[in-house]
């Protein structure tokens, strides 16, 4: 009976894997087709590896500039996020003061607050301070919008770390800053890696806020650039270039997915947290 159940679970897992991976495979396959090949049979394998589609996508939709903007936004947003989230999570996990529980509860409640709910007032506020079409401002907005989830997640990781490590380091003369940087950060690396990867992928793929806050073509990010690819092609859609552009967008996300499990294997607790 257990054998039958095990095989049923395996078959279901294989089916779900095929369902989720096939669109990625189809997108990659279509990126190498000519327009005639795609219109003749969208599901057939490409006759040859047509790299001209990637060149066309890179040039027609100005993806080179958008790619650079997306890299800048993702890196700066993630850096700002970690700069604030790590100390805030540490304070909320380790110190008890008036209002600490209320602050934690507010952060947890804000997890359910989506960016689309505050998009109009946010647009008006940034317009009033000339904050539109400004990539650093967009990075700050991204980081702040991700605060609730990341603080809630990292606070849980830090709360689970035994206090003995910090007490030993304090006996050795460690300051509060040293406790954070040399004790808690190394011990909380799995949590930090988790929020870093999830946030970076979210920043890379974010569309609604970038669409509203970036109206200058030179400041737009990759997801907005793909919409531009539709615009420049009008009614004569170059399907190969379109799918090639989607592949370019997916590459950083796929790299993060591939290196994520490898990096997790090296995130172990150090035997001597404070040096």
Positions of predicted regions on the chain:
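A structural signal for multi-pass alpha-helical bundles of membrane permease subunits
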Residues: 2-263, 267
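Single conserved hydrophobic/aromatic residue that forms the stacking wall/gate
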Residues: 266, 271-275
């Amino acid at each position: 009976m257990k054998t039958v159940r095990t095989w049923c679970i395996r078959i279901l897992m294989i089916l779900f894997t095929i369902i989720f991976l096939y669109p990625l495979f189809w997108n990659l396959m279509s990126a190498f087709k000519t327009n005639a090949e795609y219109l003749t049979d969208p599901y057939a394998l490409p006759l040859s590896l047509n790299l001209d589609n990637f060149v066309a996508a890179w040039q027609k939709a100005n993806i080179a500039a958008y790619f650079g903007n997306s890299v800048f936004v993702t890196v700066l947003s993630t850096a700002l996020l970690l700069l604030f989230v790590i100390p805030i999570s540490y304070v909320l996990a380790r110190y008890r003061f008036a209002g600490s529980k209320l602050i934690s509860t507010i952060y947890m409640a804000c997890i359910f607050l989506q960016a689309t709910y505050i998009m109009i007032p946010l647009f008006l506020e940034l317009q009033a301070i000339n904050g539109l079409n400004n990539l650093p401002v967009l990075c700050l907005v991204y980081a702040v919008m991700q605060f609730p989830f990341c603080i809630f997640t990292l606070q849980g990781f830090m709360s689970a770390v035994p206090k003995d490590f910090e007490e030993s380091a304090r006996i050795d003369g460690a300051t509060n800053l040293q406790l954070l940087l040399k004790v808690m950060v190394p011990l909380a690396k799995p949590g930090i890696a988790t929020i870093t990867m999830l946030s970076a992928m979210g920043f890379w793929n974010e569309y609604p806020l970038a669409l509203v806050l970036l109206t200058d073509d030179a400041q737009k990010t990759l997801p907005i650039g793909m919409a531009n690819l539709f615009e420049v092609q009008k009614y004569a859609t170059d399907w190969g270039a379109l799918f090639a552009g989607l592949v370019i967008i997916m590459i950083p996300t796929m790299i993060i997915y591939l290196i994520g499990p490898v990096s997790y294997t090296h995130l172990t607790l150090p035997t001597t947290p404070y040096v």
